[in-house]
Structure formats: C-alpha cells, structure tokens
C-alpha cells in the first residue's frame, strides 16, 4: 500500500515539466506545462482542457 502511495506521488511530481516560452516582446519566461496535455505551441499556458487556445483560461 505504501508503494502505491509513493508511486502516485512520484507520478504527480513528474507530471510537470519546466518549459520556457517566448512572449511577443521576445522575453523568455518560465511556465509550467503538463506532459502530454496536447496544447498548441502558440498557447502552452492558456490551453483549455479540450486542447484549444483559450485566452481567458489560465491553466
């Protein structure tokens, strides 16, 4: 049982990766993106759960 708890915590921690995105001003800024989320490259940090760009959604 402890192994399953450890495994789920490890998977949760490794599900996030650090990415660097460049905004329109050319400034690099770090953002977090879920692995395998399927967000388009033009909006990696404002992607809705459906995988489409959503300017009002911060995800």
Swiss-Prot record:
Main location: secreted
Tissue expression from the record: Expressed by the venom duct.
List of residues that carry Isoleucine amide: 58
Localisation: Secreted
Keywords on record: Amidation, Cleavage on pair of basic residues, Disulfide bond, Neurotoxin, Secreted, Signal, Toxin
The protein's name: Conotoxin Cl14.4
Transmembrane segment boundaries: none
Molecular-function annotations in GO: toxin activity
Comment text on domains: The cysteine framework is XIV (C-C-C-C).
GO cellular component: extracellular region
Post-translational modification: Contains 2 disulfide bonds.
Propeptide: 20-36
N-terminal signal peptide: 1-19
Coiled coil: none
């Amino acid at each position: 049982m402890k192994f399953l708890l450890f495994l789920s915590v490890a998977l949760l921690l490794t599900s996030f990766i650090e990415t660097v995105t460049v905004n329109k001003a050319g400034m690099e800024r770090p953002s977090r993106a879920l692995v395998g989320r399927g967000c388009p490259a033009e909006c990696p940090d404002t992607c809705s759960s459906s995988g489409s760009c959503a300017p009002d959604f911060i995800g």
